[in-house]
Amino acid sequence: MNRVYVKKEFCISCHLCEVYCRLQHSASNELLKAYKKEYPHPLPAVRVEERGNLALSVRCQHCDEPLCLYACLGGAISCDNDSGMVNYDPEKCIGCWSCILACPFGAIKQDKEQKRIFKCDLCIGEETPACVANCPNEALVYIDIQDNDINNPDSHHKQTNNIKGGV
């Protein structure tokens, strides 16, 4: 099960992860068209949170026990037990936003134009997510969580809680 993690000491808050996420999920795959001409506008499923000198790229963590899944009233969120991916079916979304409220990382976003949510899909079908492949400082890494200690104090989960003001 691969996940995206942030090496906080290398993130310079350039927001290119947001740009490449938007581009990857655009119909045209062209930067200018994705930002100016496509409708509905492609939205990035990642965002950069900044607090003082700390910056982190925040996205869906594809949790082992996804609170968004349990909160989803329309059955739009599911978990693939083989890959560990938390998936989303926009056709089933009823726009109740319960998943947004349930996510402890604030990683699920509201698409007000389409009246549904959007979240990181790890650029399904690609070898490496666009945010990771295009990070100029290699602050984002795509690693197998089975081979790494995610309970380490520098893990992305704890980093995200700290930047959001948690414990």
Q: Where are the regions a protein language model picked out?
A:
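Conserved beta-strand segments that form the floor/walls of ligand-binding pockets within enzyme
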Residues: 5-6, 87, 102
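Ordered, amphipathic secondary-structure segments that act as subunit-interaction surfaces
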Residues: 62-85
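N-terminal beta-strand motif that seeds the catalytic metal site of vicinal oxygen chelate
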Residues: 1-9
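A short local structural element in Rossmann-fold oxidoreductases
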Residues: 22, 73, 104
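Flanking helices and flexible, charged tails adjoining ferredoxin-like Fe-S electron-transfer domains
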Residues: 27-70, 90-167
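A generic structural signal for beta-strand entry/edge sites
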Residues: 3, 83-85, 117
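N-terminal signal-anchor transmembrane alpha helix
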Residues: 12, 18-25
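Aromatic-flanked redox-active Cys/Sec active sites in thiol-based oxidoreductases
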Residues: 8, 74, 90
